[in-house]
């Protein structure tokens, strides 16, 4: 499981020209799954994100989590996080989990974040979306469950 976390002032998702979800500030999460991901992987990543201290304290040190600061989450499914560009000119997505599996894990992930008390807005799984993110910092962090559990 990979999550590209971006601290943001605001973020929104449009589908067919209509805004379907938006947040006024917090975290935008681009979320992708691979074949080996499980419910345990989702639980691990949700807990990691919930406690991640990516907001500055009064000393301008990243020492405050979203739970402590307040704010919302915009979670967007992003199978292209598992693109393989090692050969040729066109990305391969064979490392991405099949849609049905990924959708179930994506929904579980969002539910875990919501159950932790966060306002969670989402994109539409599998849809072509226009995602607008106004970064704060910018702070952009890639979380990869396979790398983090080594």
From Swiss-Prot:
GO molecular function, one term: D-tyrosyl-tRNA(Tyr) deacylase activity
Domain of life where this protein originates: Bacteria
Primary site of residence: cytoplasm
EC numbers: 3.1.1.96
GO process terms (BP): D-amino acid catabolic process
Any matching Pfam family: Tyr_Deacylase
Keyword set includes RNA-binding: yes
Subcellular location: Cytoplasm
Known catalytic reactions: glycyl-tRNA(Ala) + H2O = tRNA(Ala) + glycine + H(+); a D-aminoacyl-tRNA + H2O = a tRNA + a D-alpha-amino acid + H(+)
Motif (Gly-cisPro motif, important for rejection of L-amino acids): 137-138
Keyword Cell division belongs to the record: no
Keywords noted in UniProt: Cytoplasm, Hydrolase, RNA-binding, tRNA-binding
Gene Ontology CC terms, in alphabetical order: cytoplasm
Biological role stated in the UniProt entry: An aminoacyl-tRNA editing enzyme that deacylates mischarged D-aminoacyl-tRNAs. Also deacylates mischarged glycyl-tRNA(Ala), protecting cells against glycine mischarging by AlaRS. Acts via tRNA-based rather than protein-based catalysis; rejects L-amino acids rather than detecting D-amino acids in the active site. By recycling D-aminoacyl-tRNA to D-amino acids and free tRNA molecules, this enzyme counteracts the toxicity associated with the formation of D-aminoacyl-tRNA entities in vivo and helps enforce protein L-homochirality.
Comment, domains: A Gly-cisPro motif from one monomer fits into the active site of the other monomer to allow specific chiral rejection of L-amino acids.
Complexes and interactors: Homodimer.
HAMAP family (alphabetical): Deacylase_Dtd (MF_00518)
Name the record gives this protein: D-aminoacyl-tRNA deacylase
Organism: Listeria innocua serovar 6a (strain ATCC BAA-680 / CLIP 11262)
Species lineage: Bacteria, Bacillati, Bacillota, Bacilli, Bacillales
Chain's gene name: dtd
């Amino acid at each position: 499981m990979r999550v590209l976390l971006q601290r943001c002032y605001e973020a929104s998702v449009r589908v067919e020209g209509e805004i379907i979800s938006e947040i006024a500030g917090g975290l935008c999460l681009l979320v992708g799954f691979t074949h080996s991901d499980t419910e345990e992987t989702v639980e691990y990543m949700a807990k990691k994100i919930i406690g991640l201290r990516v907001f500055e304290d009064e000393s301008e040190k990243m020492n405050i989590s979203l739970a402590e600061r307040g704010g919302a989450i915009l979670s967007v499914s992003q199978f292209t996080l598992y693109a393989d560009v090692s050969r040729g000119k066109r990305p391969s997505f064979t490392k991405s989990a099949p849609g049905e599996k990924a959708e179930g894990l994506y929904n579980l992930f969002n539910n875990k974040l919501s159950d932790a008390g966060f306002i969670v807005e989402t994109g539409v799984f599998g849809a072509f979306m226009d995602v607008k993110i106004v970064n704060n910092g910018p702070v952009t962090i890639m979380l990869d469950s396979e790398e983090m559990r080594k």
